[in-house]
Amino acid sequence: MNKVLYIKANAKPEGKSRTFKISDVFIDEYKQNNPDDEIITLDLYKEDIDFLRSKDLDTVFGPKNEESKNHPTLKYAYQFAEADKYVIAAPMWNLSIPAILKAYVDYISVVGIAFKYTQEGAVGLLENKKAVYIAARGGSYAETPYELDGIYLRSILGFFGIKDITTISAEKLDVQGENVDKILEEAIDKAKETAKNF
């Protein structure tokens, strides 16, 4: 049985978020194909996530032991490390990710949990896992230098050792004259197909 962490990062509620329209279908399709897997939903806007403070840094960068698992600053890092698969649903905002998702990444980017330092440099500790990033975007940014949301998430996940990463994006949703329903339908179809083999 695999443990799937479904990370949601959008201030818009269910029903209004175009990103969640796609990601929720992905999760439903995944459940149908993997009924025994555990899916944990983490809605970041419903969590008490703040930016890391100076008092948190010693905990994040210091040595870890059994008691570390009970430290409130490290709870997201341990939860992330315990998962086998990740579904990250977040819209592109201002060419990047929502600030709350970046704050969350800071909480999970923990030495000794997500990666470690060696004489050769940093080494990811989360190998043999996979992730899918699902995003709604107002313009057309896929595979361009402006796709900073996807570039960043693929980079940080790769830094953790996660190399199997798929991006599903609905592009041009705010471009005048585009058929938004058709764009979303195509992204949902891709989400369904991706979920079958995820």
Swiss-Prot record:
Keywords: Flavoprotein, FMN, NAD, Oxidoreductase. Pfam families: Flavodoxin_2. FMN binds at M92, W93, N94, L95. One of its GO terms (molecular function) is oxidoreductase activity, acting on NAD(P)H, quinone or similar compound as acceptor. The keyword Electron transport does not apply. InterPro entries: Flavodoxin_fold (IPR003680), Flavoprotein-like_sf (IPR029039), FMN-dep_NADH:Q_OxRdtase_AzoR1 (IPR050104), NADH:quinone_OxRdtase_FMN_depd (IPR023048). Coiled coil: none annotated. It comes from the Bacteria. Binds 1 FMN per subunit. It is an enzyme of class 1 (oxidoreductase). Its EC number is 1.6.5.-, 1.7.1.17. It catalyses: 2 a quinone + NADH + H(+) = 2 a 1,4-benzosemiquinone + NAD(+); N,N-dimethyl-1,4-phenylenediamine + anthranilate + 2 NAD(+) = 2-(4-dimethylaminophenyl)diazenylbenzoate + 2 NADH + 2 H(+). Its cofactor is FMN. Quinone reductase that provides resistance to thiol-specific stress caused by electrophilic quinones. Also exhibits azoreductase activity. Catalyzes the reductive cleavage of the azo bond in aromatic azo compounds to the corresponding amines. Belongs to the azoreductase type 1 family. HAMAP family: Azoreductase_type1. Homodimer. This is FMN-dependent NADH:quinone oxidoreductase. It comes from Clostridium beijerinckii (strain ATCC 51743 / NCIMB 8052) (Clostridium acetobutylicum). The lineage of its organism: Bacteria, Bacillati, Bacillota, Clostridia, Eubacteriales. The gene is azoR.
